[in-house]
């Protein structure tokens, strides 16, 4: 399949083990191919009736799935992981077409996805409570039990990967899930739904409903939904938390960020430059944990900046399905204009554009209406500038200088966000000292934007709470039951 040829021809809702048209509507949406600007799908947003049908299907499947042993769930999740590996090329291609990221990156995303399923398959077979001995031969024990029907609401920057990150631990714990993708990227969640069905989950265990805010509201407020996990913006996360609170539903929120990346003068310069590029330009800069505030110690500021600009200008922009492309288009026209607007404001506030920050028009005529821009490096930045304070969510790096460790820590933490942070230094004592002081849920030392599924991922402050990945996520998709067993006579006060 090549860029500019794909059109959705099947229903984009998934319920009861099959693709279906929604039973009712709450509006329509269009999905675009960012590389060309073509409409690839016009679809109906799910209304309250469709959401209820999806939840009821999930509720019925939950009764079957939750009674399976951990080993049975393990085998099915491992089979799903195997199918993802087998279909890696097809899924990665769909991700490129609907999201715009390069095929190089998309393959990495799909690999992380099947690794996530394998990881939680292993945990499914080893979940256990504990036994506590009490006086007189009595004892207590705990049971880790599933929650029920969980809701996943995904973002558009990692469509398939986020679907996997939310569904794998949920299903491993014995839950069912109704998933709502972003209306910008409705396609790839359906592929995972079909894979789960092929692997052997009960029909209805994993359902997909398409839609926007109204559909999300129906999900969050549904009385039979036990938990909501959301990835997206802070304002939307606040609304989801408020809606879920009315039903006393636990939530996991993975929200925005404005993360600091601290480059000390004793760093390995080559690795620090590569780390800064990884921290700013993956997925066209549309990554919530990106280290977009790059603090560089003054002694190496000029050398570091020169090398970063040189490497940024070499990034190959173009057709995301070509093997040598390293940066594709942004997600859509309004977002492209928003990011360009941030660059304009940065210049007005005194920042200097060292490269990029403007529209890029590929030579291939079929890409002329795509949403491309050149990756941007800003210098002469101050902490009070809009480009330094607000999440841009595009390929825009802001370089700031600093003198001392104490100074940069204070400035790095001066934000309402706390999703991620990074430090490059050869001084291992300094590295651990600095990350201990950084107010961020995920910290990197001498690397950035790596995401092993074995490690928990999540934020501090307004970047959200709860975690995805790692063993701890089991706690967010299960509940603990305590059982107290008396082996003697009841000692009564009456």
From Swiss-Prot:
According to its UniProt entry, the function of this protein is described as: Converts gamma-trimethylaminobutyraldehyde into gamma-butyrobetaine with high efficiency (in vitro). Can catalyze the irreversible oxidation of a broad range of aldehydes to the corresponding acids in an NAD-dependent reaction, but with low efficiency. Catalyzes the oxidation of aldehydes arising from biogenic amines and polyamines.
Entry protein name: 4-trimethylaminobutyraldehyde dehydrogenase
**Catalytic activity, reaction form:** 4-(trimethylamino)butanal + NAD(+) + H2O = 4-(trimethylamino)butanoate + NADH + 2 H(+); an aldehyde + NAD(+) + H2O = a carboxylate + NADH + 2 H(+); 4-aminobutanal + NAD(+) + H2O = 4-aminobutanoate + NADH + 2 H(+); formaldehyde + NAD(+) + H2O = formate + NADH + 2 H(+)
Among InterPro entries, the record links this protein to: Ald_DH/histidinol_DH (IPR016161), Ald_DH_C (IPR016163), Ald_DH_CS_CYS (IPR016160), Ald_DH_CS_GLU (IPR029510), Ald_DH_N (IPR016162), Aldehyde_DH_dom (IPR015590)
- Principal subcellular localisation of the protein: cytoplasm
Q: Which Gene3D superfamilies match?
A: Aldehyde Dehydrogenase, Chain A, domain 1, Aldehyde Dehydrogenase, Chain A, domain 2
Classification via PROSITE patterns: ALDEHYDE_DEHYDR_CYS (PS00070), ALDEHYDE_DEHYDR_GLU (PS00687)
Q: Under which pathway is this protein filed?
A: Amine and polyamine biosynthesis; carnitine biosynthesis
Per the record, the similarity remark reads: Belongs to the aldehyde dehydrogenase family.
Assembly: Homotetramer.
Modified-residue entries (N-acetylserine), positions? 2
Q: What is its EC number?
A: 1.2.1.47, 1.2.1.3, 1.2.1.46, 1.2.1.19
Q: Where is the active site?
A: 254 (proton acceptor), 288 (nucleophile)
User: Origin organism of this chain?
Assistant: Pongo abelii (Sumatran orangutan)
């Amino acid at each position: 399949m090549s860029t500019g040829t794909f059109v959705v021809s099947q229903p984009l809702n998934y319920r009861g083990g099959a693709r279906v048209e929604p039973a009712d509507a709450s509006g329509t949406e269009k999905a675009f191919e960012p590389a060309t600007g073509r409409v690839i799908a016009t679809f109906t947003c799910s209304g309250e009736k469709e959401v209820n049908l999806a939840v009821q299907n999930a509720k019925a499947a939950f009764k079957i799935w939750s009674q399976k042993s951990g080993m049975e769930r393990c085998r099915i999740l491992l089979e799903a992981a195997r199918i993802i590996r087998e279909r890696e090329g097809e899924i990665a291609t769909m991700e490129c077409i609907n999201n715009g990221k390069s095929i190089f990156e998309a393959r990495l995303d799909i690999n992380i996805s099947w690794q996530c399923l394998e990881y939680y398959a292993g945990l499914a077979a080893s979940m256990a409570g504990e036994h506590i001995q009490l006086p007189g031969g009595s004892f207590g024990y705990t049971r880790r039990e599933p929650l029920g029907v969980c809701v996943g609401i995904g973002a558009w920057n990692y469509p398939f990967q986020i679907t996997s990150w939310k569904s794998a631990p949920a299903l491993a714990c014995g839950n069912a899930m109704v998933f709502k993708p972003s209306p910008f990227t409705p396609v790839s969640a359906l592929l995972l739904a079909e894979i789960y069905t092929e692997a052997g989950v009960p029909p209805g265990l994993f359902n997909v409903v398409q839609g926007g805010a109204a559909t999300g509201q129906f999900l969050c407020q549904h009385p039979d939904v036990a938990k909501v996990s959301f990835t997206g913006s802070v304002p939307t996360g606040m609304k989801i938390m408020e809606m879920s609170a009315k039903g006393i539903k636990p939530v996991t929120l993975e929200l925005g960020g404005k993360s600091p990346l601290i480059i000390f003068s004793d760093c390995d310069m080559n690795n620090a430059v590569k780390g800064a590029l990884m921290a700013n330009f993956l997925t066209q800069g549309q990554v919530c944990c990106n280290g977009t505030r790059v603090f560089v110690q003054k002694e190496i500021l000029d050398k570091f900046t020169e090398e970063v600009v040189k490497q940024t200008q070499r990034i190959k922009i173009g057709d995301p399905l070509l093997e040598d492309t390293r940066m594709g288009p942004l997600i859509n026209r309004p977002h492209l204009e928003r990011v360009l607007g941030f660059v304009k404001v940065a210049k007005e506030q005194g920042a200097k554009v060292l490269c990029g920050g403007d529209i890029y028009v590929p030579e291939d005529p079929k890409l002329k209406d795509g949403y491309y821009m050149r990756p941007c490096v800003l210098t002469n930045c101050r902490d009070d500038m809009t480009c330094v304070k607000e999440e841009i969510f595009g390929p825009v790096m802001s370089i700031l200088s600093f003198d001392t460790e104490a100074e940069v820590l204070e400035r790095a933490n001066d934000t309402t966000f706390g999703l991620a942070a990074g430090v490059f230094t050869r001084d291992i004592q300094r590295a651990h000292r600095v990350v201990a002081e950084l107010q961020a849920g995920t910290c990197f030392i001498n690397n950035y934007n790596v995401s092993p599924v074995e490690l928990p991922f999540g934020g501090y402050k307004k970047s959200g709470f709860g975690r995805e990945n790692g063993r701890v996520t089991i706690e967010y998709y299960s509940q603990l039951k305590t059982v107290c067993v008396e082996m003697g006579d009841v000692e009564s006060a009456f």
